[in-house]
Amino acid sequence: MILIIYAHPYPHHSHANKRMLEQAGTLENVEIRSLYHLYPDFNIDVAAEQQALSRATLIVWQHPMQWYSVPPLLKLWMDKVLAHGWAYGHGGTALHGKHLLWAVTTGGGENHFTIGSHPGFDVLSQPLQATALYCGLTWLPPFAMHCTFICDDDTLQAQARHYKQRLLAWQEANHG
């Protein structure tokens, strides 16, 4: 099962993430958990989130990039849900053998995320990749949708279909 942990503080403003979720939602065995819908008060139900993670074989962290990082509720979710003794540390093997895909949208162009005057995309992904590996997850190459503020609807839809194809390819390769 694919579990999408979706974290967008302003979901009604995001055409890109909306298209991505619509495409992913057409696949079988996909569960979408919208953190800002479930926890507008930031009071996360840790047990429910851990149960959802336990059912998954592929976990997707989908969100817009905010200040070169994740939105605040996703960071809090990581702090609470990926608990010592459950996700890492002594006895913390609940996520071992599962895969993680980082699916991120950005307002900047792909060339904005190259080494030079801006941090490289590989550099920006390091904290998430380190978190995944620390929890025993297999890190997959990220899916990034760039220039989302200026893309026309056809371009957004095409990129969202590419996202769906990434998920479908993973399902077919992993019988999940």
Curated annotation (Swiss-Prot):
Cofactor(s) for this UniProt protein: FMN
Q: Which Gene3D superfamilies match?
A: 3.40.50.360
**Which Enzyme Commission number(s) are listed?**
1.6.5.2
What residue ranges carry the coiled-coil annotation?
Answer: none
- The UniProt annotation places FMN binding at H8, S14, H15, A16, N17, M65, Q66, W67, Y68, T105, T106, G107, G108
User: Subunit arrangement?
Assistant: Homodimer. Interacts with KefC.
Q: What does this protein do?
A: Regulatory subunit of a potassium efflux system that confers protection against electrophiles. Required for full activity of KefC. Shows redox enzymatic activity, but this enzymatic activity is not required for activation of KefC.
Name of this protein: Glutathione-regulated potassium-efflux system ancillary protein KefF
Record organism:
Salmonella arizonae (strain ATCC BAA-731 / CDC346-86 / RSK2980)
